Amino acid sequence: MLYHLAMVLETFYSGFNVFQYITFRTILGVLTALGIALMIGPAVIQRLVLHQVGQQVRDDGPETHLEKAGTPTMGGALILVAIAVSTLLWADLTNRYVWVVLLVTLAFGLIGGVDDALKLARQDSQGLRARTKFSLQVLAALAASTFLFATATDPVETSLVLPLVKEWVFPLGLGFIALATLVIVGSSNAVNLTDGLDGLAIMPTVLVATGLAVFAYASGHHVFADYLGIPSVPGVGELVIFCGAIVGAGLGFLWYNTYPAQVFMGDVGALALGAALGVVAVAVRQEIVLFIMGGIFVMETVSVMIQVLSYKLTGRRVFRMAPLHHHYELKGWPEPRVIVRFWIITVVLVLIGLAMLKVR
């Protein structure tokens, strides 16, 4: 909104021309989202406490988690407000990608919010039925994927792009819709599985969003895209502002979510943030890079799949508990050690992902 106002005012004062620069608006987007999260955080937490919106803890989880019972949850709503306001203020609202990523994020946030609300109403850790939640996620992702496919103006927008090799671009046709839906839903649930310790999910989300912002900026600028040998996707540069909003909102939330957490994001935040990363990766045609940079999310998801499959086939568990972070907790690692080491791994993976911009 302010971006469009600035473009009108530019006719009266040339200084407003600075708002045309994506980098400038991204900085404003980060600061706006960060400021909103920090300012309204205490009020949101206080209201959650007042209405007894407390975390339900599984009885079969690590004993150290029992003390987390009652900690305010659904703090992810704070993140979504900060992201939405910041994006609406500083992004170009005539850009289709901006609306796709924003609506997907809010749709998955709504699904997560209903799930959280049911858990609170029933006073247990079971919310929406798994089949119902998954179906709603698929519908939301399918709608976004179909829209992107139908509005694509260049074949590369619906092709599979493999990193490291310039020429490896494979047209997917209708397969794009299936791949995009899988990435969005998979990313959403992967972040949700990772959200089990204080600050564990939010910092990797911030780091991956930062990495995707670099790809979005390069892909949206045809000169940079040609130089780096990555697909040039007109319009995706505006997603840098959205990614910046995720970074700002995430850091603001981490202020209250760091160990020991004053608030948890809940499914309303985790499902939404995961979907946001997934849909941005789809838009910039970097699904495989997301798989690499978000390796922690992948590890957590795979650990659950291995655990379930092993138990069903052999009756034995590979890990002491899944997802993976609980395994290390039960091995005796203090919670902060698990969190920070997972953060460090994510930093390394994001750097590897960014290195693929040059290694081609």
From Swiss-Prot:
GO terms for molecular function: metal ion binding; phospho-N-acetylmuramoyl-pentapeptide-transferase activity; UDP-N-acetylmuramoyl-L-alanyl-D-glutamyl-meso-2,6-diaminopimelyl-D-alanyl-D-alanine:undecaprenyl-phosphate transferase activity. Keywords: Cell cycle, Cell division, Cell inner membrane, Cell membrane, Cell shape, Cell wall biogenesis/degradation, Magnesium, Membrane, Metal-binding, Peptidoglycan synthesis, Transferase, Transmembrane, Transmembrane helix. Its EC number is 2.7.8.13. CDD domains: GT_MraY (cd06852). GO terms for biological process: cell division; cell wall organization; peptidoglycan biosynthetic process; regulation of cell shape. The chain crosses the membrane at residues 26-46, 73-93, 98-118, 136-156, 168-188, 199-219, 235-255, 263-283, 288-308, 338-358. It is an enzyme of class 2 (transferase). Its main location: membrane. It is a multi-pass membrane protein. Catalyzes the initial step of the lipid cycle reactions in the biosynthesis of the cell wall peptidoglycan: transfers peptidoglycan precursor phospho-MurNAc-pentapeptide from UDP-MurNAc-pentapeptide onto the lipid carrier undecaprenyl phosphate, yielding undecaprenyl-pyrophosphoryl-MurNAc-pentapeptide, known as lipid I. Belongs to the glycosyltransferase 4 family. MraY subfamily. This is Phospho-N-acetylmuramoyl-pentapeptide-transferase.
